[in-house]
């Protein structure tokens, strides 16, 4: 049975446990704390404190997410969409994508090798046979 999050100490402890596993965005962390029974009146001040102390960082979360998803073969369009769905500001997402050290052309080649065994289609009509490839944002036709 999980503990009730009815005190600032309990909320902070749970938030730090979640952050110890991986970086979280503020919106995501708020959602997880709410799911565990914490109220917004107690969540917000604790998240503000964690951010002031440098323990909760949107910039680190963006960097970590971009690195992870690009490493899984996703392109900037898909990553941008996923981060937007997670409640992050469009300007922050764009800045993080610009500042990321991801070589998108190299990632695209890696994904191409993995999905098509390095074979180049003879024409553009061959690409729709793998629509999932273009949806990842890694397609050379986009």
From Swiss-Prot:
The keyword DNA-binding does not apply. It is found in: Cytoplasm. Residues 118-142 are annotated as: Disordered. Keywords: Cytoplasm. InterPro entries: RecX_HTH_1st, RecX_HTH_2nd, Regulatory_RecX, WH-like_DNA-bd_sf. GO terms for cellular component: cytoplasm. The keyword Cytoplasm applies. Its main location: cytoplasm. GO terms for biological process: regulation of DNA repair. It holds the Pfam family RecX_HTH2. PANTHER family: REGULATORY PROTEIN RECX FAMILY PROTEIN. Belongs to the RecX family. Modulates RecA activity. This is Regulatory protein RecX. It comes from Pseudomonas putida (Arthrobacter siderocapsulatus). The lineage of its organism: Bacteria, Pseudomonadati, Pseudomonadota, Gammaproteobacteria, Pseudomonadales.
